[in-house]
């Protein structure tokens, strides 16, 4: 007799690092390998919309999303700002991983890190490679200061062809990074979106994500205050540490196979810097993929290609 598949679709609250934190777990068969997804930001979790983009991924993996400490459904006014450090997030990630492995009776899992989450992933992989089969680095952050400078130059080049445009005016107004004022950062991110190199390459896709967050069961309007408060809280206490990160010096080697995925149009984390890190990284195996129709969120913008890419390079169980 062929055993029946046992699907799963749950929200699970855990006590992680002495704070309540929320997981969302989905898959068609709990016997499939686990995939833990570390969201970007800091402070921009995906639980509110991501289920719309991972149906194919759930055929191959039991997919776990986690609203990290101080963000989204894991936000609380009681969380100490002293705990909002990369080191605490690394410990949280390891604790979440160990709970998942014990709960599902697995020895290892697959780890995906997107943007800010890719910083956490590199540190976790460096400390506990024994817990993971393969790492999927999506829009891999390497050196935020260099990435910002590179993106700014790309935007200036685009704006030069449109000298009378609002883009040209704004890039000249803020000048080159580093920027000291919040308004300069806000204008810069607006310029990134104008050039279609931001969250998604197609603005319609970003609007769809917002609609899904507002109308979905996971967040909805009732929980948007937690999302927004968590976003402000996370950025306030983690941004300085984020900008000090340099993967070239901090994580020159990883002891697990690595697959890097970058969007061709990404101007938040330009592909050339991620690819330079990929080329210099010491790892037992590594692959590089560029998604031609994506900006910063290839797993959302091209979900079928993303699912196929991950499943093809999951060497264990699939």
Swiss-Prot record:
Q: What class of enzyme is it?
A: hydrolase
Give one GO molecular function term: hydrolase activity
| Active-site feature positions | 115, 266, 296
The alphabetized list of GO BP terms reads: proteolysis
Query: What keywords were assigned to this record?
Result: Aminopeptidase, Hydrolase, Protease
As recorded in UniProt, its EC number(s) are 3.4.11.-
Q: Which Pfam families match?
A: Hydrolase_4 (PF12146)
Q: In terms of domain of life, where is this protein from?
A: Bacteria
Q: Report the function annotation for this chain.
A: Probable aminopeptidase.
By sequence similarity, the record places it as follows: Belongs to the peptidase S33 family.
Name of protein: Probable aminopeptidase YbaC
Species in which this protein is naturally found: Bacillus subtilis (strain 168)
* Annotated gene: ybaC
């Amino acid at each position: 007799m062929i055993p029946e598949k046992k699907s799963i679709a749950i929200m699970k609250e855990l006590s992680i690092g002495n704070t309540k934190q929320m997981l969302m777990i989905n898959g068609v068969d709990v016997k499939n390998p686990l995939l833990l997804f570390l969201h970007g930001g800091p402070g921009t979790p995906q639980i509110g919309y991501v289920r719309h983009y991972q149906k194919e991924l759930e055929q191959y993996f039991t997919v776990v999303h986690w609203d990290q400490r101080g963000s989204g459904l894991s936000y609380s006014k009681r969380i100490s700002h002293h705990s909002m450090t990369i080191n605490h997030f690394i410990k949280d990630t390891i604790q979440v991983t160990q709970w998942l492995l014990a709960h599902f009776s697995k020895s290892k899992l697959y780890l995906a890190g997107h943007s800010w989450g890719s910083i956490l992933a590199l540190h976790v992989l460096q400390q506990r490679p024994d817990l993971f089969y393969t790492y999927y680095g999506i829009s891999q952050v390497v050196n935020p200061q260099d990435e910002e400078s590179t993106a700014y130059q790309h935007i200036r080049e685009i704006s030069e062809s449109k000298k009378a445009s609002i883009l040209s005016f704004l890039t000249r107004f803020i000048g080159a990074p580093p920027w000291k004022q919040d308004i300069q950062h806000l204008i810069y991110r607006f310029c990134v979106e104008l050039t279609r190199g931001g969250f998604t390459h197609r603005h319609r896709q970003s609007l769809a994500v917002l609609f899904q967050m507002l109308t979905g069961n996971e967040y909805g309007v009732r929980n948007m205050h937690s999302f927004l408060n968590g976003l402000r809280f996370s950025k306030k206490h983690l941004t300085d540490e984020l900008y000090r990160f340099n993967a070239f010096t901090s994580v020159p080697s990883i002891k697990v196979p690595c697959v890097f995925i970058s969007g061709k149009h990404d101007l938040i984390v330009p592909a050339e810097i991620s690819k330079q890190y990929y080329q210099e990284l010491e790892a037992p195996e590594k692959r590089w993929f560029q998604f031609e129709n994506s900006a910063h969120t290839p797993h959302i913008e091209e979900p079928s290609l993303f699912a196929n890419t991950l499943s093809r390079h999951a060497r264990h169980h699939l």
